[in-house]
Curated annotation (Swiss-Prot):
Entry's Gene Ontology cellular component terms: cytosolic small ribosomal subunit
Disulphide linkage map: none
Name of the protein this chain belongs to: Small ribosomal subunit protein uS9
Species for this entry: Coxiella burnetii (strain RSA 493 / Nine Mile phase I)
PROSITE patterns (alphabetical): RIBOSOMAL_S9
One annotated GO biological process: translation
Keywords: Ribonucleoprotein, Ribosomal protein
Assigned protein family: Belongs to the universal ribosomal protein uS9 family.
Amino acid sequence: MAQAAKKQNLGTGRRKTSSARVFLRSGTGQIIINGLPLDEYFGRETARMVVRQPLVKLDVQSRFDVYATVQGGGDSGQAGAIRHGITRALIQYDEEGGEGGTWRSTLRKAGFVTRDPRMVERKKVGLHGARRGTQFSKR
């Protein structure tokens, strides 16, 4: 007979071109991203801070273990995608009877629930970039 699966909550987060699947389990507070600890995966402290934000806001960083797989984009986009995924997983945990359904409003006020719609604007034909044109010469 198969062993009972450990209870976990799944949250999918996206930011720019990054996509993250986040698994939230009760534990001691370790954060593993693509098989590496958070401190090894992200070199910049700001990216690590962004990932921890939802847990710190709710003061539950030592109650959950976070396992995330993320692909696409760069450091900033990946950190934002993981944060979005953690937020969704926390809301799912909360609404299934965790804390009485109060976390969503707290996380929404902090701005973590809304998916950031900003994307890189495409390069246009005849321009150097999305908006930069050729240099104007009066004569």
